[in-house]
Curated annotation (Swiss-Prot):
Binds 1 zinc ion per subunit. One of its GO terms (biological process) is carbohydrate metabolic process. It comes from the Bacteria. The lineage of its organism: Bacteria, Pseudomonadati, Pseudomonadota, Betaproteobacteria, Rhodocyclales. The reaction produces a racemic mixture of D-glycero-alpha-D-manno-heptose 7-phosphate and D-glycero-beta-D-manno-heptose 7-phosphate. The gene is gmhA. GO terms for molecular function: carbohydrate derivative binding; D-sedoheptulose 7-phosphate isomerase activity; zinc ion binding. Belongs to the SIS family. GmhA subfamily. InterPro entries: GmhA/DiaA, Phosphoheptose_Isoase, SIS_dom, SIS_dom_sf, SIS_GmhA/DiaA_subfam. It catalyses: 2 D-sedoheptulose 7-phosphate = D-glycero-alpha-D-manno-heptose 7-phosphate + D-glycero-beta-D-manno-heptose 7-phosphate. Catalyzes the isomerization of sedoheptulose 7-phosphate in D-glycero-D-manno-heptose 7-phosphate. This is Phosphoheptose isomerase.
Amino acid sequence: MDLIDRISRQFEDSAQTKLAAVEWMAAPIAQAVEMMTASLMNNGKILACGNGGSAADAQHFAAELLNRFEMERPPLAAVALTTDTSTLTSIANDYDFVQVFSKQVRALGQPGDVLLAISTSGNSPNVIDAIQAAHEREMHVVALTGKGGGRIGEMLSPTDVHLCVPADRTARIQEVHLLTLHCLCDGIDCLLLGVEE
């Protein structure tokens, strides 16, 4: 095996996946940017959740909004529901791991807030439960998935936004997810700050 060739193929495959995704995802990403910006401008907040690498993505996104992305601006209201180990373990222990995000959504979510629900397969039970809780709280949902969207794609309401990566390989989906999150951050900043370029 030639490691250099293998690494080169990884880069090429990643680039091709991203280029193929833009045709499907640019318009819904723009819709998600507008939804999130409208919520933030109306004193709403964004709650984000996911498992494993998607949990890291939820935290990354919340950090970019709370601190800053590439432009100076005031902090924005975003909370990753993946970070409080006492809350996560108490819910998982006393109830069920399926409820680790939904209980937080029911406690923190308000009408007009946005839930960013991340699942590469679209089938994560605790993310599905969080979406159901968000709907109960009259929140908007932006779902970031892959592999056809799974059960999440089937349960979204017409007012939700589905950002589904047209790929089946988890690593490639995660790479497009990160780029998508950066596009969301950039778009929110541009709308809030009136950037025209």
